[in-house]
């Protein structure tokens, strides 16, 4: 299990599409079985991408309409071998605007926090 996160997260007030990316490089061969993105009420989209040592890139998971109320572990149909040197990039996008009906306060700069009114950029692989 590998946990990817941005602890210094700070989403500006009224930002409609604030994005942060976390990258992890595997030092040895691994087998990927599942992925799970996690954010709170302002989460808008999530994406995991593999950048292989030979330069190829592959989308592992794309969640274009993230919903806090539908948190799930996405299990791959087939386990995916990732060779040593592969980078997994986890990108989360948040909507801190008034157009987000779930947003409790668009005028607030939102930090990392465990409470639902704060935010997280957390991905498990």
Where are these regions (language model features)?
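His-enriched metal-coordination microenvironments in redox/metal-binding proteins
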Residues: 1-125
């Amino acid at each position: 299990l590998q946990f990817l996160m941005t602890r210094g997260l700070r989403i500006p007030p009224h930002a409609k599409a604030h994005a942060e990316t976390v990258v992890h490089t595997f030092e040895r061969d691994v087998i990927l079985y599942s992925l799970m993105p996690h954010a709170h009420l302002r989460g808008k989209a999530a994406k995991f991408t593999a950048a292989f040592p030979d330069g190829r890139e592959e989308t592992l998971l794309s969640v274009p309409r993230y919903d806090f109320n539908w948190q799930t572990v996405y299990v791959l149909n087939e386990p995916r071998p990732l060779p040593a040197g592969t980078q997994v990039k986890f990108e989360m996008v948040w909507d801190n605007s008034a157009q987000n009906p779930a947003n409790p306060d668009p005028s607030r700069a939102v930090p990392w926090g465990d409470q639902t009114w704060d935010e997280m950029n957390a991905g498990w692989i």
